[in-house]
Swiss-Prot record:
Family according to the record: Belongs to the bacterial ribosomal protein bL33 family.
The entry's keywords: Ribonucleoprotein, Ribosomal protein
PANTHER family xrefs: 50S RIBOSOMAL PROTEIN L33, CHLOROPLASTIC, LARGE RIBOSOMAL SUBUNIT PROTEIN BL33C
NCBIfam families in UniProt: PRK00504.1, PRK00595.1, rpmG_bact
Protein name (Swiss-Prot/TrEMBL): Large ribosomal subunit protein bL33A
GO biological process per UniProt: translation
Any one Gene Ontology molecular-function term assigned to this protein's record: structural constituent of ribosome
Signal peptide location: none
Pfam family, one: Ribosomal_L33
Amino acid sequence: MRVNITLACTECGERNYITSKNKRNNPERLELKKYCPRDRKVTLHRETK
């Protein structure tokens, strides 16, 4: 079952990316290093509801 999730920057809190994940394979919250246009650098982004 794939669900849509939002990735938010851990430094500024801005929600920059929307993606989907398979809850069966990844039950925990997703953490990815992505580019934040507000900070103008690569930061850690965490899954939010």
